[in-house]
From Swiss-Prot:
The lineage of its organism: Eukaryota, Viridiplantae, Streptophyta, Embryophyta, Tracheophyta. Keywords: Auxin signaling pathway, Nucleus, Repressor, Transcription, Transcription regulation. Residues 25-39 have a biased composition (Low complexity). This is Auxin-responsive protein IAA8. The gene is IAA8. PROSITE patterns: PB1 (PS51745). Residues 103-199 form the PB1 domain.
Length: 205
């Protein structure tokens, strides 16, 4: 009996109390308390990260919009492509497209004058402007196809020296200036020749 009593007395008080009450040791409740505290600190960090991402997206959106809207009509067209296209259109030629060109120089030769001269045809006002400019350049009386028949009759009764305007087309044929519309003339003319009205070469055109 004394041995049993001493054995019961030697048992720790805490063990008997835990076994009777059914409560968990205090050491097991400490870890969940720490995890709860640590999890409670995470939401502020997540919110700050979200705000940083939103501000970054806003900055990227503003940058992209400023780059894309260079051309209001076509946002996908770069400025360099627009500039290249504009320059190409200004210098373009082709049938009936002389209005896009900046100049159209041709050589002009006059009978009896050894040196030819260059003339820009685009600024001129049709055949009338062309003949007026040539008459001023070469100090000569020049007519063209529309007046040629009337002049041929009058020319037989006068001693004045007149000249007619002819041109060479892209195929190498010599024609009387004025036999085709002005726009078609600009697309086909290669060079001009001012011939005497009584020249056999003139009447062969």
């Amino acid at each position: 009996m004394e041995c049993m009593a001493s054995t019961e007395e030697s048992l720790p008080a805490s063990s008997s109390m835990d076994s009777c009450s059914g409560e968990l040791p205090t050491t097991t409740t400490t870890a969940p308390a720490q995890s709860t505290a640590s999890s409670g600190c995470r939401p502020p960090a997540t919110a700050a990260k979200r705000r940083s991402l939103i501000s970054t997206d806003l900055r990227l959106g503003l940058t992209l919009s400023s780059v894309v809207h260079i051309d209001g009509n076509n946002p996908s067209t770069p400025r360099s492509s627009l500039t290249t296209a504009t320059v190409t259109a200004d210098r373009g030629g082709g049938g009936g497209g002389h209005g896009r060109r900046r100049s159209l120089f041709v050589k002009v030769y006059m009978e009896g004058v050894p040196i030819g001269r260059k003339l820009d045809l685009l600024p001129l006002d049709g055949y009338k402007g062309l003949v007026a400019r040539l008459a001023s350049m070469f100090r000569a009386s020049i007519t063209y196809h529309h007046c040629h028949r009337q002049f041929a009759v009058v020319g037989m009764k006068t001693n004045k020296v007149h000249h007619v305007l002819t041109y060479e087309d892209q195929e190498g044929d010599w024609m009387m200036a004025g036999d085709v519309p002005w726009e078609l003339f600009l697309t086909s003319v290669k060079r001009l020749r001012i011939a005497r009205a009584d020249d056999k070469y003139c009447y062969s055109c």
